[in-house]
Amino acid sequence: MQFKVYTYKRESRYRLFVDVQSDIIDTPGRRMVIPLASARLLSDKVSRELYPVVHIGDESWRMMTTDMASVPVSVIGEEVADLSHRENDIKNAINLMFWGI
């Protein structure tokens, strides 16, 4: 579901990702996601517009917008958070990456 954060079932450098695909678009067996990385891994100088900071529990994460990818639904694990309240920030990061706006 769009803007939900899920665990990643497979071995990966990323443990979490946010589903950014519209729920009205059906791509059988796949979803568009943006992985999350610990905020500690990125300098504060890195753009917060392109790589928004999100908080899940007591941890800070950065959305790795430039690593957005289509993944099989079979790798989508447990839902751990809902980022619907950050919808505008997420959309703005995607717009910035693709259209520079």
Swiss-Prot record:
Q: Read off the SUPFAM superfamilies from this record.
A: Cell growth inhibitor/plasmid maintenance toxic component
Q: What is this protein called?
A: Toxin CcdB
Effect of changing residue 99 to L/Q/S/Y: reported as:
Loss of toxicity
Q: Which UniProt keywords apply?
A: Plasmid, Repressor, Toxin-antitoxin system, Transcription, Transcription regulation
Q: What does UniProt give as GO cellular component?
A: toxin-antitoxin complex; transcription repressor complex
Role summary: Toxic component of a type II toxin-antitoxin (TA) system, functioning in plasmid maintainence. Responsible for the post-segregational killing (PSK) of plasmid-free cells, also referred to as a plasmid addiction system. Half-life of over 2 hours. Cell killing by CcdB is accompanied by filamentation, defects in chromosome and plasmid segregation, defects in cell division, formation of anucleate cells, decreased DNA synthesis and plasmid loss.
Answer yes or no on keyword Transcription regulation: yes
Q: Which InterPro entries does the record associate with it? A: CcdB, Plasmid_toxin/cell-grow_inhib
GO MF entries: DNA topoisomerase type II (double strand cut, ATP-hydrolyzing) inhibitor activity
UniProt-listed Pfam families: CcdB (PF01845)
What family does this chain come from, according to its entry?
Belongs to the CcdB toxin family.
Could you say what a knockout of this gene produces? Disruption of both ccdA and ccdB has no phenotype, except for increased plasmid loss.
**Annotated organism of origin:** Escherichia coli (strain K12)
How does the record describe its quaternary structure? Homodimer. Forms a complex with GyrA, probably a tetramer GyrA(2)CcdB(2), in which GyrA is inactive. Forms a complex with antitoxin CcdA; there are both high- and low-affinity binding sites for CcdA such that both CcdA-CcdB(2) and CcdA(2)CcdB(2) complexes can form. The CcdA-CcdB(2) trimer is sufficient for rejuvenation, whereas maximal operon repression occurs with CcdA(2)CcdB(2). When the CcdA:CcdB ratio is lower than 1, a CcdA(2)-CcdB(4) complex is formed which is devoid of repression activity. In this case repression is alleviated and both proteins are produced.
Q: Name one GO biological process term.
A: negative regulation of DNA-templated DNA replication
Protein's gene: ccdB
